[in-house]
């Protein structure tokens, strides 16, 4: 006589089979979900890299005709008079000086050109057209940058989950390295961004951003930002490294400071 009834053994066998099949299907489902999250995160990262280049080009092509029509029909030149006044006056002065010099040379040679006033008038009209085109370009770039910045910010906020997945990949890769390699990568990144040879890069970046938003080149403001912003960023970064890695890996902090010295 069997100590255990066949009904119980069949029930246990069926339960074990169902449990095994459910665990297998659950593992397959988790694998499919992981693959979907990985592909979605990679597509999101690719879009995040491409969009800052594509959006300004497409927006500028659509906005420039509208801005040109608005600028030429509406009496709105006063909006940007202050921004471009010095440049326009400087160009007028250069034209005037050149034609005065030409007239002095002609007088010294005993020749009198009757067309000098016509030439001055033509150059003045050309200068006004250039000034008008510069103002249109400034408005187009300003609107393009503002709309593009708002779009990218919304895209980043809406993709927090995908950014969290990418961040977990980066952290997993970073923490799998040795402390020496971690310190080397941190030192390389900090030297490229805020090292002793980075002020020229900061000057170019700040100048490019200011011009794209319609601000005239100002050497004092650029020098002030270059001399203060990288120092503040370097201090914040060192404090973050000390607070974050001093508890996780004290040896990394020691190696980093040794390599930095």
UniProtKB/Swiss-Prot annotation:
TM segment ranges: 39-59, 138-158, 184-204, 221-241
Keywords: Antiport, Chloroplast, Hydrogen ion transport, Ion transport, Membrane, Plastid, Plastid inner membrane, Potassium, Potassium transport, Transmembrane, Transmembrane helix, Transport
GO biological process: potassium ion transport
GO molecular function: antiporter activity; proton transmembrane transporter activity
Catalytic activity: K(+)(in) + H(+)(out) = K(+)(out) + H(+)(in)
Cell compartment(s), UniProt: Plastid, Chloroplast inner membrane
One Gene Ontology cellular component annotation held by this UniProt entry: chloroplast inner membrane
One Pfam family per UniProt: CemA
Membrane topology, as annotated: Multi-pass membrane protein
Family: Belongs to the CemA family.
Annotated function: Contributes to K(+)/H(+) antiport activity by supporting proton efflux to control proton extrusion and homeostasis in chloroplasts in a light-dependent manner to modulate photosynthesis. Prevents excessive induction of non-photochemical quenching (NPQ) under continuous-light conditions. Indirectly promotes efficient inorganic carbon uptake into chloroplasts.
Protein name as annotated: Potassium/proton antiporter CemA
Naturally occurring in which organism (per UniProt): Pinus thunbergii
């Amino acid at each position: 006589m069997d100590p255990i009834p066949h009904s119980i053994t069949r029930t246990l066998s069926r339960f074990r089979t169902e449990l095994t099949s459910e665990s297998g299907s659950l593992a397959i489902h988790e694998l499919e979900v992981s693959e979907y999250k990985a592909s979605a995160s990679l597509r999101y990262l690719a879009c995040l890299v491409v969009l800052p280049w594509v959006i300004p080009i497409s927006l500028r092509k659509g906005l420039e005709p509208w801005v040109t029509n608005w600028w030429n029909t509406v009496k709105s030149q006063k909006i940007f008079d202050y921004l471009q006044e010095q440049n326009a006056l400087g160009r007028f002065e250069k034209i005037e000086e050149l034609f005065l010099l030409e007239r002095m040379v002609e007088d010294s040679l005993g020749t009198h050109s009757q067309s000098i006033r016509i030439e001055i008038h033509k150059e003045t009209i050309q200068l006004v057209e250039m000034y008008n085109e510069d103002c249109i370009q400034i408005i187009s770039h300003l609107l393009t940058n503002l709309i593009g910045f708002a779009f990218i910010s919304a895209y980043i906020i809406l993709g927090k989950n995908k950014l969290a997945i990418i961040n977990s990949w980066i952290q997993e890769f970073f923490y799998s390295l040795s402390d020496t390699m971690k310190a080397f990568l941190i030192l390389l990144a900090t030297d490229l961004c805020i090292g002793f040879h980075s002020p020229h890069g900061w000057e170019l970046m700040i100048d490019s951003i200011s011009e794209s938003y319609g601000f005239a080149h100002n050497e004092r403001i650029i020098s002030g930002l270059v001399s203060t912003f990288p120092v503040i960023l370097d201090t914040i970064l060192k404090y973050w490294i000390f607070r974050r890695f001093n508890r996780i890996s004290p040896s990394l902090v020691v190696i980093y400071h040794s390599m930095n010295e």
